[in-house]
């Protein structure tokens, strides 16, 4: 059953249909929020808050076919509201790096990372994630968001544009400049980008 069909059932009074939407979207939104905030506990809380907001406002969604864009927009606004409330800078955990012209990474990313048996390899992975986290914090938030949505959520530029209320060209521009900025950071730090990706 499609999201649109579940939404129709929910709006007719079938609460279980919304539970089905949660089951379908919880993992994906959790990973989006986790990469935006970099904190697992906060990600869990804000994922729940996102669904609460969606539950209250689903009746106002004009086009059920745009449910994906709508949910990401709610999740992003929930994160931003949280950061304003906390009055602190957000951190990011992004464990990959791709050219914007390449195919987007699989959006279904595991909530927990694969266990690494080799202690040395595990330490290298932690160091790589830390470096990527710091690099992401050095670029503008608007660019980070587009990178997360495109590379890790698998959204199309049209969907990203809708969620952020910007043009498609602006979304592509932010993606390009964000990736370019990250490359410059790695060059400045004399970091082998390919090695970091391999170790993730």
How does the language model describe each region?
Residues 1-28, 35, 120, 137, ...:
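N-terminal module of bacterial RNA polymerase sigma factors
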Residues 11-20, 30-49, 61, 163, ...:
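Short, charged helix-capping/linker segments at alpha-helix termini
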Residues 31, 45-52, 66-77:
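Structural recognition of an alpha-helix C-terminal capping motif at a helix-to-coil junction
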Residues 100-134:
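Acidic, proline/glycine-rich intrinsically disordered inter-domain spacer in sigma factors
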